[in-house]
């Protein structure tokens, strides 16, 4: 059995190589900060379930990601956040969606898992449960930032569900032939969704994912993030957190398929993750992070980029956005 491993993501999508430093660096610093928190927690023997909740809570508190405080707006200018969490050892899980006042959706998902006979609570029922549990809530206006209002305005003007990085607020240079081979920016990428997967030295696994969804989404739209087996999954073999176009992730049951290929086909983590991302989902739509019980890490994506970070007990660590050779 290998030692502990951890991986986290800050979303996959159409991230141009020309992304300005003022947009790139805060996300990289956020990933670095949260990775360190996760590493220290694993070193101190915290269970992976606690680790992934802790890391995703921290990611939700960083406005540069599309989760928690940074959540994007619906077509009515409101926030509807969603999250899920799963423990690989027990297969217990919890999920929430339609949240507009809960500061840290991932912790409410954990409470659904721990304190109710259910797996999934949504909208008013979830918010009532949050009040019952004494979860920290704020006025919904807390989540309405100037940047997200502007992003929604651009999306409405363009009559599209999402404005991607390449169209947001700065000039985009003409593409050369190499760039034209990359997945096209189609406005459907799910920018900034956050997730974390972890395994301890005993092979215990957990996964957590949180998001604000898609810019200009219809009120009531639910994506892959709170759906166990789509955006989040963990069992005794692996833990997976997905990001990208939610509808593509749902229809391909991305997270569960990685585990199923390992279980029923005997594929390695990397083989299973690569197959799901590159063979079973449309180009330009999906990325994921995954760890195995043996401590392996996989972080494939078929978008132009994915904000990601990882570390292992043997000292390896990585923070990256675009493909690495």
Swiss-Prot record:
**GO molecular function terms here?**
asparaginase activity; beta-aspartyl-peptidase activity
Gene3D superfamilies documented for this protein: (Glycosyl)asparaginase
Q: What is its EC number?
A: 3.4.19.5
PTM annotation: Cleaved into an alpha and beta chain by autocatalysis; this activates the enzyme. The N-terminal residue of the beta subunit is responsible for the nucleophile hydrolase activity.
**Where exactly is the site Cleavage?**
192-193
Q: Which domain of life is it from?
A: Eukaryota
Q: What's a Pfam family this protein contains? A: Asparaginase_2
UniProt keywords, alphabetically: Autocatalytic cleavage, Hydrolase, Protease
Q: Which GO terms describe its biological process?
A: proteolysis
Q: Which InterPro entries match?
A: Ntn_hydrolases_N (IPR029055), Peptidase_T2 (IPR000246)
What's the catalysed reaction? Cleavage of a beta-linked Asp residue from the N-terminus of a polypeptide
| Binding-site positions, substrate | 221-224, 243-246
Name the SUPFAM superfamilies for this protein: N-terminal nucleophile aminohydrolases (Ntn hydrolases)
Q: In which tissues is it expressed?
A: Developing seeds.
Active site positions: 193
| Functional note | Acts in asparagine catabolism but also in the final steps of protein degradation via hydrolysis of a range of isoaspartyl dipeptides.
Assembly behavior? Heterotetramer of two alpha and two beta chains arranged as a dimer of alpha/beta heterodimers.
The entry sums up its family as follows: Belongs to the Ntn-hydrolase family.
**Name of the featured protein:** Isoaspartyl peptidase/L-asparaginase
Organism this protein belongs to: Lupinus angustifolius
Upper taxonomic classification of the species? Answer: Eukaryota, Viridiplantae, Streptophyta, Embryophyta, Tracheophyta
């Amino acid at each position: 059995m290998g030692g502990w491993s951890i991986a986290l993501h800050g979303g996959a999508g159409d991230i141009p190589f020309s992304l300005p430093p003022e947009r790139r660096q805060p996300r990289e610093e956020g990933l670095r900060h949260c990775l360190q928190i996760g590493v220290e927690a694993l070193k101190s023997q915290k269970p992976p379930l606690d680790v992934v909740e802790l890391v995703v809570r921290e990611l939700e508190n960083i406005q540069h990601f599309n989760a928690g405080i940074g959540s994007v707006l619906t077509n009515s200018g409101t926030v509807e956040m969603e999250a899920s969490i799963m423990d690989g050892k027990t297969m217990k899980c919890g999920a929430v969606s339609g949240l507009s006042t809960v500061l840290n959706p991932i912790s409410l998902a954990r409470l659904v898992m721990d304190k109710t006979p259910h797996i999934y609570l949504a909208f008013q029922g979830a918010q009532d449960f949050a009040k019952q549990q004494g979860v920290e809530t704020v006025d919904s206006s807390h989540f309405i930032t100037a940047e997200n209002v502007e992003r929604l305005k651009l999306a409405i003007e363009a009559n599209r569900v999402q404005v991607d990085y390449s169209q947001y607020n700065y000039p985009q240079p003409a593409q050369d032939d190499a760039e034209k081979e990359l997945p096209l920016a189609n406005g459907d990428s799910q920018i900034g969704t956050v997730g974390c997967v972890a395994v301890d030295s005993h092979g215990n696994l957990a996964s957590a994912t949180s998001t604000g969804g898609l810019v200009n989404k219809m009120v009531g739209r639910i994506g892959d993030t709170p759906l166990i087996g789509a955006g989040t999954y963990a069992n005794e073999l692996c833990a997976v957190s997905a990001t990208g176009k939610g509808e593509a992730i749902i229809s391909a049951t991305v997270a569960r398929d990685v585990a199923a290929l390992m279980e029923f086909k005997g594929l390695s983590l990397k083989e299973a993750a690569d197959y799901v991302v590159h063979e079973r989902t449309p180009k330009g739509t999906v990325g994921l992070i995954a760890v195995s019980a043996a401590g392996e890490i996989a972080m494939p994506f078929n978008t132009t980029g994915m904000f990601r970070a990882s570390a292992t007990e043997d000292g390896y660590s990585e923070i990256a956005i675009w493909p690495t050779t």
